[in-house]
């Protein structure tokens, strides 16, 4: 993409309404625009990041055996009355009527609807286990939306729901999602720690929040430093191997880790003082097992191997992709702007033409652009006629992992300068060497 043809509305000043780093940088770098309280449009560069996050989430959900569906945002109030949650939810749930005066709602979550889908089609234990997921925009009317997309009223969510014959099956479904989440966050470039957590209004008896440590985190968390050195499950993880999954979950739940709500001072005291980490954290995922909380009132049953009907045991697994984008910025930035992990960077590299109109600079920039594009690097070429300082500031702000600087002096020497955004290190390379290095990293 050429910057001269790209919609990138950069803000020079820090927005007054932005309280935290991610909100400020997302507005300044032209990722989002606020349309009303807690509701945002995603602009081209922000949407590219969001789509990359969703792609990783999809790949890992599919790898774990989940099936993608898409449920509607508008739900019937009757389903929620079946589960007993319609009156339990407060004003955060947007309630509406259609022209026939039927009561509807803008779904804040989808347990009822997915249970209705399941009970309509699945009759036998032979069709289990089953995990259905979707990625959908949701709305919760927060009393005080703040922190940009970190706590907004409209947000994107990946919800997965598992259905099993009994508790043992449901526990393994939970373990599959647990391991899938570890891999998902690692691929996004974040170090997430699973912590014991309250089940909240969804309910249940087994629950973990996945937390990344960040100074601006909204939650106080406590964990053993051992988590920082644990190896994330690799791509060769066999999600059909219950023993392997159990071993991974055991390793990732044995050291102490808990949110403030579940913190136990007696257990915390058993952790060596030098291993205690007390910090702020951001929730990026939450998984629950809630058994028959929804299958019982809604009659979701299957015939078991004994010929009898059994209520299915269920779990719910959520990741907020839009929130995850903000969390990645909170975890990786500096005074100049965002520092994107390579996996979710909007572009693979930025090419900075220091002197558009100069035959040499234009020629080298075009050569780099064509070679990197053909190699799948997806570069952003800054071909705008601006002063060098503004070009460098823009590139640092939007946080592309690598910058290739093309200037008259370097071109005359047959070289370009390659800058690593994270480390700030610069090196002069021959043009072909720079192309080879960047394509090898693609």
Curated annotation (Swiss-Prot):
Alphabetized UniProt keyword annotations: Aminoacyl-tRNA synthetase, ATP-binding, Cytoplasm, Ligase, Nucleotide-binding, Protein biosynthesis
The EC number(s) this enzyme carries: 6.1.1.15
Q: Which GO terms describe its biological process?
A: prolyl-tRNA aminoacylation
Do you know which InterPro entries this protein is assigned to?
Answer: aa-tRNA-synt_IIb, aa-tRNA-synth_II, aa-tRNA-synth_II/BPL/LPL, Anticodon-bd, Anticodon-bd_dom_sf, Pro-tRNA-ligase_IIa, Pro-tRNA-synth_IIa_bac-type, Pro-tRNA_synthetase
Q: Which GO terms describe its molecular function?
A: ATP binding; proline-tRNA ligase activity
Name the catalysed reactions: tRNA(Pro) + L-proline + ATP = L-prolyl-tRNA(Pro) + AMP + diphosphate
GO cellular component terms?
cytosol
Compartment(s) where it occurs, according to its Swiss-Prot or TrEMBL record: Cytoplasm
Q: What class of enzyme is it?
A: ligase
- Coarse class of the protein's main subcellular location: cytoplasm
Q: How does it assemble?
A: Homodimer.
Q: Please give the function described in this protein's UniProt entry.
A: Catalyzes the attachment of proline to tRNA(Pro) in a two-step reaction: proline is first activated by ATP to form Pro-AMP and then transferred to the acceptor end of tRNA(Pro).
Q: Which family does it belong to?
A: Belongs to the class-II aminoacyl-tRNA synthetase family. ProS type 2 subfamily.
NCBIfam families xrefs: PRK12325.1 (NF008979), proS_fam_II (TIGR00409)
This protein's name? Proline--tRNA ligase
| Taxonomic path | Bacteria, Pseudomonadati, Pseudomonadota, Alphaproteobacteria, Hyphomicrobiales
């Amino acid at each position: 993409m050429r910057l001269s043809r790209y919609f990138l509305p950069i803000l020079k000043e820090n927005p007054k309404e932005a309280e935290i780093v991610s909100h400020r940088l997302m507005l300044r770098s032209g990722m989002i625009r606020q349309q009303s309280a807690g509701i945002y449009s995603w602009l081209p560069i922000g949407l590219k990041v969001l789509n990359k996050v969703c792609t990783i989430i999809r790949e890992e959900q599919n790898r774990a055996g989940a099936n993608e569906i898409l449920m509607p945002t508008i739900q019937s109030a009757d389903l929620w009355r079946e589960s007993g949650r319609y009156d339990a939810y407060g004003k955060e749930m947007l309630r509406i009527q259609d022209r026939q005066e039927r009561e509807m709602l803008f779904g804040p979550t989808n347990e009822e609807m997915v249970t209705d889908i399941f009970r309509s089609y699945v009759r036998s234990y032979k069709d289990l286990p089953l995990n259905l997921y979707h990625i959908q925009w949701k709305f919760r009317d927060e009393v005080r939306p703040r922190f940009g997309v970190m706590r907004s009223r409209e947000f994107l969510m990946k919800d997965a729901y598992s259905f099993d014959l009994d508790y043992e099956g449901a526990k393994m479904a939970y373990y599959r999602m647990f391991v899938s989440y570890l891999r998902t966050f690692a691929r996004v470039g974040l170090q997430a720690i699973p912590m014991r957590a309250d089940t909240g209004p969804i309910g249940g008896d087994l629950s973990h929040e996945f937390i990344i440590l960040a100074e601006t985190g909204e939650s106080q968390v406590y964990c053993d430093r051992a988590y920082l050195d644990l190896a994330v499950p690799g791509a060769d993880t066999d999600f059909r191997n219950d023993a392997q999954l159990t071993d991974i979950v055991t390793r990732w739940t044995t050291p102490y880790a808990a949110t403030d709500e579940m913190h136990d001072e007696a257990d915390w005291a058993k952790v060596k003082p030098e291993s205690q980490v007390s910090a702020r954290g951001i929730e990026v995922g939450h998984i629950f097992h809630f058994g028959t909380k929804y299958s019982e009132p809604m009659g979701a049953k299957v015939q078991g191997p004994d010929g009898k009907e059994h209520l299915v045991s269920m779990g719910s697994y959520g990741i907020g992709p839009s929130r995850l984008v903000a969390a990645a910025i909170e975890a990786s930035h500096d005074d100049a702007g965002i520092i994107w992990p390579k996996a979710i960077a909007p572009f693979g590299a930025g090419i900075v033409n220091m002197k558009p109109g100069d035959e040499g600079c234009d020629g080298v920039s075009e050569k780099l652009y064509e070679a990197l594009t053909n190699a799948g690097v997806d570069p952003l070429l800054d071909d705008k006629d601006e002063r060098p300082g503004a070009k460098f500031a823009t590139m640092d702000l939007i946080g592309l992992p690598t910058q290739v600087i093309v200037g008259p002096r370097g071109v005359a020497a047959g070289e370009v300068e390659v800058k690593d955004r994270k480390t700030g290190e610069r090196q002069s390379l021959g043009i072909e060497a720079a192309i080879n290095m960047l394509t090898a990293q693609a």
